[in-house]
Amino acid sequence: MFGLEIYDYHSAGGKNVILAYVEKLSKQEQLEIYDVRGEIRRSGLDAFEKLDTRQLRGKLWEIKLSQNRIMYVIMNKDAVAFLHICKKQKGKAEKQDLDKALNRARKENLL
């Protein structure tokens, strides 16, 4: 199995909002996220079988990490789009975070 290319969401000004968020986290949280990204790049779709994932709505899914959530859409057999990342606060995704990820997916024509 070949790995997937990861496309992070960028703001209108060109800022990579995913990596900007990650850079503000503790070193331990950063390592956890970079490990997940590395596994996806190496193992492709098989990586998602090993991760704690959950379908949120339609093509929008989330990866649940120890302290954070990454909301994503599988674009095709070769690529995944990371649309939003946030702190885990409750047992489920917060409405504002879900709405933000859905809006970004629509803006990028991923839904």
Question: What positions do the PLM features span?
Answer:
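Short, conserved beta-strand/beta-arch hydrophobic-aromatic motifs that form part
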Residues: H84
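Basic, Lys/Arg-enriched alpha-helical interface segments
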Residues: M1-Q67, K77-A79, K87-L111
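Short, surface-exposed beta-strand/loop micro-motifs that present aromatic residues
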Residues: I70-V73
